Amino acid sequence: VNGLLQLYGLCVLALFLKMLVISCYQGYFRLRYRAFANVEDAAFVGRAVMAQDLPQVRRAARAWANDLENIPLFFVLGALAIALQTPDDVTGLLFCAFTVARAIHTLTYLGGWQPWRSLAYGVGLACLLVLAAMIGKALL
């Protein structure tokens, strides 16, 4: 397996696991407090429906939504970078930096820690922009 492809695969796997953890985090708080916003879920545990989700669940849902705005872009740009054979060293560094930045972003989002959340978001965004520029250069 190509070294860069292997690194990309590891980053994709790490991001998948990170997103899975956010789902489990939400589920943990829903189950712990038996607090559900869906009628069928509340009925299943013999509780009334909550007017709104718990604060921890809402925050995790926002972190998840932010992931859905950024991580698919990484999947596409990363695959294109490999296919277009952008420089391995820089591309690999960007893959790792993006993955670490997204993990830090999630932790700081769940903890409500500014300015660290914005800094982590900015690092991840910068990685995407540099990947896009490298792809553009490879195409021209």
Task: Explain the meaning of each model-derived region.
Residues A103-C127:
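Interfacial loop-to-transmembrane junctions
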Residues A65-L80:
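Core segments of transmembrane alpha-helices
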Residues L131-L140:
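Juxtamembrane boundary at the C-terminal end of a transmembrane helix
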Residues C24-R62:
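Cytosolic, membrane-interface loops and tails of multi-pass inner-membrane proteins
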Residues V1-Y25:
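Long, highly hydrophobic alpha-helical transmembrane signal-anchor segments
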Residues A79-A83, A103-L107, G136:
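Alpha-helical transmembrane segments of multipass membrane proteins
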Residues F16-Y33, A103-L107:
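Transmembrane alpha-helical segments that form the membrane-embedded catalytic/substrate-channel core
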Residues D88-A97:
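Structural signature of hydrophobic alpha-helical transmembrane segments
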